[in-house]
């Protein structure tokens, strides 16, 4: 998220392709969105599932085992990178992946990021629709990640923890009738329906991206604008002088945030919250700003990020139209 939209623009200008990796969830979600729009449906929400409880935002590489041991059969802890896996658990990975989807599809984040509502795969259309229609979303046209765990800690049956989904709206009585007749997992009103993929295979399907780029000059999902960012958010009360340890560490997690808010408030992108020292205290749950850390303005990653902020200083500057 630090510079993806800028890199995609550079690749296109050079005649190349900048692509999400097929097989990982963001590219699969982009395919869901493309399918829905090409078929003439309005995309209400798109996203994935994960294992989530609110206290996971405070998890760290030392105590993440308490979570991992509940659902993974780990025979040798040395085979696991706890910092990496902690980023999967603490909400960071979900924020990164849903931001990638927003920047590639034209969907937008909710104003307070992801809410992780528990949902079975059969409840997607009931849960992932606007609150005004009885769902959990603040509006249509957003991303959301559903949880495979209820807030009381019990597992959700028929969850989508490894899968992806899209929720669509039927604009006609005929479409809504088809949702029911063809078992498109409609909500109780019949107005909304869902399509899901139960699994993703990560790198095992990457060859599809390579073939698509090489043979058709077509990415399997790529940024078209800067709509969503991932900002460093304090896992606990942080003290001035502490050294931040980045994604999956002890200090911060990555929260999906509308890009215009990130730019307006000068929020610190998660990708640059590593090996930088805090200049002031930050309360637990607080979003860090550039001014809160002692960063090197000459660092190459910082320079590229600042270049992207200048290029996309207004929402969707340079964005291609999303059909």
Place the predicted regions along the sequence by residue:
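Rossmann-like NAD(P)H-binding beta-loop-alpha module
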Residues: 12, 23-87
């Amino acid at each position: 998220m630090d510079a993806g939209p800028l890199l995609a623009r550079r690749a296109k200008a050079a005649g190349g392709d900048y692509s999400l990796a097929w097989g990982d969830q963001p590219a699969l979600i982009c395919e869901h969105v493309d399918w829905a729009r090409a078929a003439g449906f309005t995309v209400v929400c798109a996203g994935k599932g994960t294992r989530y409880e609110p206290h996971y935002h405070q998890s760290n590489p030392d105590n993440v085992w308490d979570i991992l041991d509940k659902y993974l059969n780990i025979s040798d802890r040395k085979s696991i990178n706890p910092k990496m896996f902690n980023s999967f658990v603490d909400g960071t990975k979900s924020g990164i992946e849903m931001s990638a989807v927003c920047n590639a599809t034209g969907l937008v984040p909710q104003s307070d990021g992801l809410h992780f509502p528990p949902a079975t795969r059969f409840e997607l259309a009931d849960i992932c629709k606007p609150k005004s229609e009885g769902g959990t979303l603040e509006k249509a046209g957003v991303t959301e990640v559903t949880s495979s765990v209820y807030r009381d800690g019990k597992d959700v049956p028929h969850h989508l923890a490894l899968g992806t989904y899209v929720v669509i709206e039927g604009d006609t009585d005929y479409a809504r009738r088809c949702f029911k007749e063809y078992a498109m997992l409609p909500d109780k009103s019949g107005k909304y329906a869902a399509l899901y993929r139960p699994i993703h295979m990560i790198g095992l399907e990457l060859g599809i991206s390579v073939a698509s780029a090489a043979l058709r000059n077509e990415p399997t999902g790529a940024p078209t604008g800067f709509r969503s960012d991932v900002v460093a958010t304090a896992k606990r009360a942080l003290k001035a002088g502490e050294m931040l340890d980045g994604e999956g560490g002890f200090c911060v997690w990555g929260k999906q945030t509308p890009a215009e808010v990130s730019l307006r408030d000068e929020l610190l992108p998660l990708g640059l919250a590593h090996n930088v020292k805090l200049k002031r205290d930050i309360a637990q749950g607080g979003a860090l700003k550039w001014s809160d850390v002692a960063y090197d303005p000459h660092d190459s990653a910082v320079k590229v990020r600042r270049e992207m902020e200048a290029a996309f200083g207004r929402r969707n500057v340079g964005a291609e139209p999303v059909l």
